[in-house]
């Protein structure tokens, strides 16, 4: 069944199955690791909640970071979906307090975040330090804005392929791509592979910094 045609109930079940599949196939443990999920209204529902559940099952301390709101609302297919509580306002979030970063997609979410200078700088700081980052679907739009994709191999939702190439990325059509601590995937259908690689890279911790990721 195509992912876009699944019901809300089926989608929630998929998130649970994805997390369970991850736990059976990946023994990495994130106990003691603190992970930020940067998002705002219009994030793709499964692309936040599925990684969130996988990270929590790996015993990570996960915080939702967002600008200016107590809670944010997902977009689900053609309408608004579930809400999630914001744990840390963007204005108070410090990259040095986190071990890794997740960037969910959704058409609305990254388009709003990329216009927030504090959000762009927050993302860039993870690359400057060499901390692992996972971005899915339209999430890599934030990587373009932060100017951290030049020379990197990655994937994304197909509609932003040209934008990523123009920003200097090597775009490939794979379900999950790992490049020196950066994990990317194309769509919600890739979540099982995305979650597994995300946790694996987050467990490894800081990666060697690249000069292209340190541009001002």
Language-model region placement:
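Catalytic nucleophile serine of serine hydrolases
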Residues: 137
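Extended, subdomain-level signal for the structured scaffold at the beginning of enzyme domains
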Residues: 15-129, 133, 141-153, 161-216
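N-terminal amphipathic/basic-hydrophobic helices that include classical n-h-c signal peptides
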Residues: 1-22
């Amino acid at each position: 069944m195509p992912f876009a045609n699944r019901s809300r109930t089926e989608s929630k079940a998929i998130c649970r199955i994805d997390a369970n599949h991850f736990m059976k196939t990946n023994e990495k443990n994130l106990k003691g690791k603190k992970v930020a999920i940067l998002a705002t209204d219009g994030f793709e529902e499964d692309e936040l909640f599925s990684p969130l559940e996988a990270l929590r099952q790996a015993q990570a301390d996960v915080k939702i970071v967002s600008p200016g709101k107590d809670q944010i609302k997902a977009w689900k297919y053609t309408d608004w979906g579930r809400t999630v509580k914001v744990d840390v306002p963007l204005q108070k979030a410090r990259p040095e307090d986190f071990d890794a970063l997740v960037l969910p997609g959704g058409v609305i979410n990254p388009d709003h975040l990329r216009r927030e200078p504090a959000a762009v700088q927050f993302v860039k700081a993870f690359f400057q330090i060499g901390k692992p980052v996972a971005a899915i679907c339209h999430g890599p739009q934030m990587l373009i804005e932060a100017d951290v994709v030049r020379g990197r191999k990655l994937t994304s939702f197909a509609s932003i392929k040209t934008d990523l190439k123009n920003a200097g990325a090597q775009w490939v059509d794979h379900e999950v791509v790992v490049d020196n601590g950066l994990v990317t995937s194309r769509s919600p259908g890739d979540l099982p592979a995305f979650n597994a690689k995300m946790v694996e890279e987050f467990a490894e911790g800081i990666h060697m910094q690249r000069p292209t990721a340190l541009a001002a």
